[in-house]
């Protein structure tokens, strides 16, 4: 990270990054930390750098992703009326006096929605550095060859947490959110082992919340084993439904891409 920031503030532009790994492994946290460091260092630097984070999973389309980028850059973008070319023109004017680092989370949500991907356009611009975040490294290698030849991202793999690391994370969350004694260390360890199998620490947060709500509904002050088991089952069902919905959306986007090509 230090090397990355040094490169950015020395030249005004750094190598593109592609952060990938399973859901809930800290990819977003890593990118946001880097952006925070850039904002802190930029105050002491002679090179003005704007750090922007956008979640393409929420913006969903290249247009709304670009619109959100410009809003975070300080441009007042109306909800309707602007076309993509106007957003791009405003972005190019922005680059006349500053560098920009853009982190695009869940980039797979927009990367195949047009023949000329937005990330390809952004990468062609001077003084622009991209941090792309996805659950799948295949998303970057499936970019058009001309985009890959210029993008040339540094790949950063976010490794899954160990059971002990997950337990520590969950314990910190419990200490901040629950009253002392609400859940035993034994049950916390059980949840951590389950989360380790799933590979997504956010699953553990949802299990804790669901288990706490079940205990509250039963008018109990402590979370019991049955609460945890029910919460795991409930959140596992919700997770499978979400995975199926994501797969359906992905297949739909691939079908649309083939039709365009």
What are these regions (language model features)?
Residues 2, 16-23, 83-88, 225:
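Short amphipathic alpha-helical segments embedded in low-complexity Lys/Glu-rich regions
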Residues 4, 194, 214, 253-257:
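Short amphipathic alpha-helical elements of helix-turn-helix/winged-helix folds
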Residues 13-33:
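Walker A/P-loop nucleotide-binding motif
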Residues 31, 48-50, 57-169, 177-195, ...:
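Mid-core helix/loop region of P-loop NTP-binding domains shared across ATPases and GTPases
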Residues 41-49:
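Flexible phosphate/Mg2+-sensing switch loops adjacent to catalytic phosphate-binding sites
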Residues 221-261:
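Winged-helix-like regulatory helical subdomains adjacent to P-loop NTPase cores
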């Amino acid at each position: 990270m230090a090397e990355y920031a040094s490169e950015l503030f020395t030249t005004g532009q750094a190598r593109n990054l592609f952060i990938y790994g399973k859901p809930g492994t800290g990819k977003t946290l890593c990118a946001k930390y880097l952006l925070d460091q850039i904002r802190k260092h930029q105050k002491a630097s002679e090179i003005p750098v704007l750090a922007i984070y956008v979640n393409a999973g929420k913006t969903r389309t290249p247009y709304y992703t670009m619109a959100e980028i410009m809003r975070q850059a300080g441009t007042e973008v109306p909800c309707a009326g602007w076309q993509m070319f106007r957003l791009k023109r405003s972005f190019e004017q922005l680059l006349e006096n500053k560098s920009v680092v853009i982190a695009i989370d869940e980039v797979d949500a927009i990367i195949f929605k047009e023949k000329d991907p937005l990330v390809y356009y952004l990468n062609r611009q001077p003084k622009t550095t991209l941090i792309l975040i996805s659950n799948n490294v295949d998303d970057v290698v499936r970019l058009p060859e001309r985009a890959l030849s210029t993008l040339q991202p540094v790949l950063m793999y976010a490794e899954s947490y160990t059971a002990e690391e997950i337990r520590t994370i969950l314990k910190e969350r419990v200490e901040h959110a629950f009253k002392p004694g609400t859940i035993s260390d034994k049950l916390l360890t059980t949840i951590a082992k389950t989360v380790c199998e799933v590979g997504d620490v956010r699953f553990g947060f949802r299990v804790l919340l669901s288990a706490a709500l079940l205990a509250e509904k039963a008018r109990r002050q402590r979370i019991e084993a049955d609460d945890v088991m029910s919460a795991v089952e409930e959140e596992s069902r919700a997770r499978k439904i979400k995975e199926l919905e994501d797969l359906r959306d992905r297949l739909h986007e691939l079908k649309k891409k083939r039709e365009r090509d």
